[in-house]
Curated annotation (Swiss-Prot):
One of its GO terms (molecular function) is oxidoreductase activity, acting on the CH-OH group of donors, NAD or NADP as acceptor. The active site is at Y163. This is Dehydrogenase/reductase SDR family member 1. NAD(+) binds at I19, D64, Y163, K167, T198. Its main location: endoplasmic reticulum. It is an enzyme of class 1 (oxidoreductase). The keyword NAD applies. InterPro entries: NAD(P)-bd_dom_sf (IPR036291), SDR_fam (IPR002347).
Amino acid sequence: MVAPMKGQVCVVTGASRGIGRGIALQLCKAGATVYITGRHLDTLRATAQEAQSLGGRCVPVVCDSSQESEVKSLFEQVDREQKGRLDVLVNNAYAGVQAILNTTNKSFWEVPASIWDDINNVGLRGHYLCSVYGARLMVPAGKGLIVIVSSPGGLQHMFNVPYGVGKAACDRLAADCAHELRRHGVSYVSLWPGLVQTEMVKEFMAKEDTPEDPLFKKMKPDFSSAESPEMSGKCVVALATDPNILNLSGKVLPSCDLARRYGLKDIDGRPVKDYFSLGYALSQVSSLGWLNSFLPGFLRVPKWVVTLYNSKF
């Protein structure tokens, strides 16, 4: 089996389950040594065992990304054990999913203000902490890739206010860090997965009391064709092995765009749903949905249209 990342060292935060787990599995399958973090050693060990069965090496490390001392200790361990080498950092840890699911039909003033910290202490501040300590290993080597897992929630309202603000900040974090890292040969990108069939979302969709929930109604039409968590992993492997990755640094990279760029399909062979196709865009407008079946898949909404539509000026 080809191992394009053999010898490379990676860190994936929040890899006990969901997207982080999927990324860790694919990085190990590509032959890398992968440090995975989470707050519970038992689930980390389960992920590590499965990942190592695919190839590579997986090292579970208990680390709360909201605690700088624990983040610092994580990267000191990588530095010590890998002689200063770090090739890929994936900022994925996120502690806000349950808070989002519990408040889907409420406005920001109707929920405790502490939801801001529930969502963004790990999902934004934690990413910055990891970026700081990860960059300190990458910059001296003159190479490396940092990926932050974000979403279109940074463009327009999705779920709630703290979520959208946090995701917009993640995209800006990638852009500004990329600006400062470029001269050192280190890339930083923002990855936008599509709708993903994570364990927690599957549980939410399976509950008997959710059919009338507005979030359930929003996700139901696309959930059966949603991406597997490992699709994000395939995207990260493709980026990490791209010799021209610096050309993409600072950019927002939707998984459907990366699937087209690198010829990727999901782990079960399914094509990745293209949320930027013209057909999909029209399907979201009730009076125009019928046009979808007549449009070829290669017709896409230009990025400048997306930018203009979401412009704040």
